[in-house]
Swiss-Prot record:
Residues where Mg(2+) binds: 187, 201
Binding site for ATP: 45, 52-54, 94, 99
Chain residues that bind substrate: 251, 308-310
Obligatory cofactor(s): Mg(2+)
Coiled-coil residues: none
GO cellular component: cytosol; succinate-CoA ligase complex
Annotated protein name in UniProt: Succinate--CoA ligase [ADP-forming] subunit beta 2
Enzyme kind, highest EC tier: ligase
Function of the protein: Succinyl-CoA synthetase functions in the citric acid cycle (TCA), coupling the hydrolysis of succinyl-CoA to the synthesis of either ATP or GTP and thus represents the only step of substrate-level phosphorylation in the TCA. The beta subunit provides nucleotide specificity of the enzyme and binds the substrate succinate, while the binding sites for coenzyme A and phosphate are found in the alpha subunit.
Keywords: ATP-binding, Ligase, Magnesium, Metal-binding, Nucleotide-binding, Tricarboxylic acid cycle
Stated family: Belongs to the succinate/malate CoA ligase beta subunit family.
Reactions catalysed: succinate + ATP + CoA = succinyl-CoA + ADP + phosphate; GTP + succinate + CoA = succinyl-CoA + GDP + phosphate
């Protein structure tokens, strides 16, 4: 589960990481009062669990309380990548001298964690890595030993961070361990004109498998019950939200994982993992497609099924049902092979939906889904 920025900063504060004074509100009038309490000037930030807030106009610097009220009024109710802004956070501005990036993230390949750090913060770390890969340090962290001062010094040296960041690196690791997080990120971590190290923005992703020992977040999970993961879980679906734009549905974890890799190899990013399992019914397929299509980040959907216990005609029937229940506005690429594949293809041909295409191979289906997602993203940016 992802936390909102204001929740992440409260965790940082609890663990001794310096953050600016800030307060959350859903009222423009209250925003004026908060700005006044902060000294007049304030950064007004949309609180949504997605990126791209700044580019969407969801972050504004207000020079006085009146501007803060106006900014809050503008931001509240905005739609940012399909997320409605219900609250804003007003934070005290900082005089920034330098910006850095630091994070700890679970590395599933090694079974440990990675410290990722850069002396070039304040922008998407992927952009920095693509432009100057040598500017991003990746240091493996053994979870058995963790991050103490010596390890933090090594991370800071590798990334070119100043010595003052070492204490924050140690404390950020404590946030990850004590809160059972899969990711803790500060971007930017800044050095102010006064020489203070301050976490201006943060992201924390909690491990849902550890919820039994993190009761403090139970209420937050309840408030977030309309999330895609919660909706999928209520339908008994094995769904994991990812950060891409191509929705992926398959039968069997191995096939779905392979499909994710092929999509990535085609230059796109998977938006999710969704395994409908063996013996899935038409109802399960329809439910899965409904969840994936409701993700605002999804630009195209790839259904990749090898029929065994799960018959391809049942999958096709589920797709047809979903088309009758949900207004399809995103292109759907379907690859069926195996048990009753010919029948399944015939069902989809008979439905003849203009946004549904079929492919005969996994590679071909992934390439087509990736191209459609790229085209949709480009059209959206142009619009």
């Amino acid at each position: 589960m992802d936390l909102y920025e204001h929740q992440a900063r409260e965790l940082f504060k609890e663990h001794g990481i310096v953050v600016p004074r800030a307060e959350v509100t859903d009222s423009p009038e209250r925003a004026r009062e908060i700005a006044r309490a902060l000294g007049g000037r304030a950064v007004v930030k949309a609180q949504v669990k997605t990126g791209g807030r700044g580019k969407a106009g969801g972050v504004r610097l207000a020079a006085d309380p009146a501007e803060a009220e106006e900014a809050a009024r503008h931001i509240l109710g905005m739609d940012i990548r399909g997320h409605t802004v219900d609250t804003v956070m007003l934070a005290e501005p900082c005089e920034i001298e330098r910006e850095f990036y630091v994070s700890y993230v679970l590395d599933r390949a090694s079974g440990g964690f990675l410290a990722i750090a850069s002396a070039e913060g304040g922008t998407e770390i992927e952009e920095v890595a693509a432009r100057r890969p040598e500017a991003v340090a990746r240091i493996p962290v053994d979870p058995a030993t963790g991050v103490h001062t010596a390890t933090a010094v090594r991370i800071a040296d590798a990334a070119g961070l100043p010595p003052q960041t070492v204490d924050t690196l140690v404390r950020l690791w404590k946030v990850l361990v004590r809160e059972d997080a899969l990711l803790v990120e500060v971007n930017p971590l800044v050095r102010t004109a006064e020489g203070r190290i301050v976490a201006l923005d943060g992201k924390v992703t909690l491990d849902d498998n550890a919820r039994f020992r993190q009761s403090r977040w139970g209420e937050t999970r309840q408030e977030d019950a309309d999330s895609l993961e919660a909706r999928a879980g209520a339908k008994g679906l094995n769904y994991v939200k990812l950060d891409g734009e191509v929705g992926v549905i398959g039968n069997g974890a191995g096939l779905v994982m392979s499909t994710l890799d092929v999509v990535a190899g085609c230059g796109a990013r998977p938006a999710n993992f969704l395994d409908i399992g063996g013996g899935a019914s038409a109802r399960v397929m329809a439910d899965g497609l409904s969840v994936v299509l409701s993700d605002p980040d999804v630009r195209s959907v790839l259904v990749n099924v090898f029929g065994g216990i799960t018959a391809c005609d049942a999958v096709a029937d589920g797709i047809v049902r979903a088309l009758d229940e949900v207004r399809l506005t995103k292109p759907l690429v379907v690859r069926l092979d195996g048990n009753n594949a010919a029948r399944g293809r015939a069902l989809l041909d008979a439905r003849a939906h203009p946004l549904v295409e079929q492919a005969t191979t996994m590679d071909g289906a992934a390439r087509r889904a990736a191209r459609l997602a790229t085209a949709a993203s480009t059209a959206g940016q142009a619009g």
